[in-house]
Regions:
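Phosphate-binding loop of NTP-binding sites
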Residues: 1-110, 162, 166-169
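Adenine nucleotide phosphate-binding catalytic loops in nucleotide-utilizing enzymes
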Residues: 72-79, 91, 109-173
């Protein structure tokens, strides 16, 4: 996505590393590798279509926005780049269904949408914001999938966490 990549990558690295062990390379330069780990989490960027070099097993698209205006001519050019990236995914695309552009991708790959609106595959419900962070329940494909507490604030942090929860759900963790 254009925003939230580093946060989502760091969250996913933390979660998977605590469950099964994971290698990762985050956009801020943080990385870790262990030859025994099965998973590798990589933050990639849409700038100059650099992300088209990758063919991930899963891809997460947090959002699409007109960014890098020195390179992309308009939002349709950005959407075309994301479409090509997503179609390079080997297994499943996980995308924020609440984003105004992700549903325009018209992909050949299966897509699993996350968000807070009812038309997503995985949904945050009963959301409560407090001085301690965010408390919410998750419904995945119509079934209760757990209650979560995040020590973070804001809707975007909630959506980034839902992207990570979506990977865990799909991997049956």
């Amino acid at each position: 996505g254009c925003h939230g990549k580093t946060t989502t990558t760091a969250m996913l690295a933390h979660v998977l590393n605590s469950i099964v062990g994971a290698n990762y390379l985050i956009g801020d330069g943080t990385g870790y590798a262990n030859k025994d780990n099965e998973y590798f989490i990589l933050e990639s960027c849409e700038y100059k279509r650099h992300f088209l070099e990758y063919h991930p097993y899963y891809s997460i698209i947090t959002n699409i926005d007109l960014d890098h205006v020195d390179y992309y001519k308009d939002i349709d050019d950005v959407i075309d780049a994301y479409r090509e990236f997503a179609n390079n995914t080997e297994n499943l695309v996980i995308a924020c269904g609440d984003d105004q552009y992700t549903r325009f991708l018209d992909l050949t790959k299966p897509v699993f949408y996350y968000g807070i609106t009812e038309d997503n595959d995985i949904i945050a419900k009963e959301i409560e914001y407090s001085e301690n962070g965010i408390h919410f329940e998750v419904e995945a494909e119509g079934n209760y999938y757990g209650t979560y507490d995040l020590p973070f604030y804001g809707k975007h942090m909630l959506l980034d966490a839902l992207a990570c929860i979506s990977i865990c759900y799909y991997e049956r963790m």
